[in-house]
Amino acid sequence: DVVMTPMTLCYFNFYQTESRKGEGLHIGGHIPFEKVYAWNPYEGMSDEAREHIIGVQCNMWSEYIKDMDTIEVMLLPRLGAMAEVQWAEDRRDESTIRQKMETMRKFYDACGWNYAPYYFEGRQ
């Protein structure tokens, strides 16, 4: 059995934007929210192989990350996209995730958490 965690989709210490908009020093390429949300961990697998996937996982390698505030920004809101990949599987809907993430943004604000604004820009 396996937990799916491919580097090109699940390493959240990678940049969130291609232009690296004030994201500080990190490592690797970029993995935007939309790419995480669109991931189908079962794509191209037989039913038999699917049965061996017990979950998905994102990773945060911290050797280039200076503090917890930066970790929050690197995780949020992509962590919400990863949760949808696991929970909703093939029931995901772009219009639904936008609404859910607006609700989550209010929650992040109420908790005083830091998050990357890139997904939300122009959607208020």
Predicted regions and their residues:
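Substrate-binding groove of N-acetylhexosamine-processing glycoside hydrolases
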Residues: 1-124
